[in-house]
Amino acid sequence: MKTPRSVVASITSQLSQAGLISLLTLSSLGALYAAPLPSSFGVWDRGEAMDPKIYPYLRGTTCDSPWNEVEKADGVYDWSILDKSLERAQRENLSLYLSFEAGPKTPNWVYTKGVPKVLTEGGKKADSFPFYPYYLSPVYKTYYHRFLFAMANHIKSYPKEVQQRISFIQVKTGCTGDECPYKGDAVDEKYSLTTKGAEWRAFRLETFALYNKLFGKASGLNISLLLSNVEPETEDGKADFVEEWKWATANLQDGFGIKNGALSRGHHLSGERSSMTMFLPYLVDAKGLTLFRRSEMDQTWTRPLYQLNVPLNFYWGAINALNSGQSVWDVTKSAVEQSKAQGFDYSFYFFNKYAGQIYPATATHAFCALHKGLDAADVVAYPEAEFGKAAHGNLERMEKIRAVYGKYGAANDDKKALKLGQVGQRGDQAGFNDVGWNIWPDNYSRLLYQIAPDETSIPLWRVGGPITPTSPIYSRFARGFEAASAKNALYFRLHEGFSADASPKVMTLTVVWYDGVAGSTWKLDYDIGAPTMKTALTVTGSGDKKWHHEVVTVKDAVFRHGGTKGSDFALINTDHKDDVFSLVEVNRGGQELPALRPPTDVRPVGGFAKGTKYNSDKSKKGGK
């Protein structure tokens, strides 16, 4: 059944009067957005109504109000999903982000109006949904736009204090949040649309402009948007979503959100380096355009690699995400529920502590997690003439790189996984690899950096021996002294602006170190604005083979890079024995109590120990 032209014309007239037709022509207006407050950055649940009294690290939640649930009948709206979510957010003092999924969640009645029903075949998830709308159908766009217009009006009906619970809206133009038109390929070629194609791009940009008009500053709601598949040209010349990036940066000039699911789901994942470097200047101490970043933890944590040591993997996943400037970490229900029993809720508190530390002048905390990733894609660090051709599948090159650092603990436990992309690694990798392809090569940090790490210290992996299910979280990566090669100091420098002037300040420093040698000694020196650094702490080891937290508060810290090598403070070897360090933290003021510490007793919980590979999971769905 086709919709009469008079009906389409009537609806189109209504939308046109509201200024919602041909919105791309309005892009020159450049709507401005108020980005979510950094105080809302941290761990969120994925809309599963987890109780923040039981899980106090939760700072927010999500609400998807899919079109087929809201408008089950033509023009009849059921707002109960959204109403209940906002009521809960207000009651429990949570932030909330929204999405309004359409695409395969288009109401069935829309197809009776003349919208073509698209069937798909092929692809990994072609059976995810039975059918899809043809997005370019004028009838589809007419009713879809009407739905979004009604959604905006309903949000405007809430009191201001309720509206302010909404941190951002994730724009979903196609399937779920993946931003593809279909899972698989259209059976009928005349309905074919591809994720990187011009027709799909035009539809997305039109939808972006619609959201901009309906929910942005000009609408009075002033809600930020989060966009997927939006990025500048990459270092290797890829320009798949550059037009989307250009539109967003021209029209959402006060900032917007981006999605990157992988960075909080693990470490040493293929492609993570490019993903970090591309956006980090817009996320931490941004100059001009400011972005925020959302990522999620799905069922990756139940897969083999994570299950080798769950607390350790969650910790380094959190560290990896913070290093990339991540703002919001959506965590699946199963992980939230198991977090305390399995001892990895520490990682959520740690993430919360640092997620909002994005402006050095106002930041209260900074950290540097000591690490070296052996990136086989780096031909400067590992020349092809010495290590072989730089190709993702060149395992011989990867093994040659690893061999250089084998004496420091570097190993590749699952060589097959070295060839995989990050999705395959998250699902099927069954061992820790210290070499990778396009992985992060340096320390992980937020506003605190080590100076010349390889010149003054050595990298270390698997401190204390092979990683087991009960190994301490810090044992995965570290750096240390090597007296035999005259590497006897680790120098650190805070981000410019963290210490604004030369006046004395109260600062607390925390050093996590491994006590591996009885009688070993080291000290912490810091910048007081004098020609020589001052000693704040001296430590003597007992050799107990355990990780320790040393905490010292100083009241005369200047931290204006006046120490040795332009440092603010340094860890100095005071004998010929070698000490090992994993984490260094700085916070303004005195020590915070109770101190945030990881559990000392890690016990694997029955039923979660082995993990399930993607290729042995018939559904192949991560789920929630």
Positions of the model-derived regions?
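Extracellular carbohydrate recognition and processing domains
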Residues: 531-563
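Short beta-strand-plus-loop segments that form exposed binding edges in beta-rich domains
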Residues: 570-577
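Glycan-recognition and processing domains
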Residues: 388-497
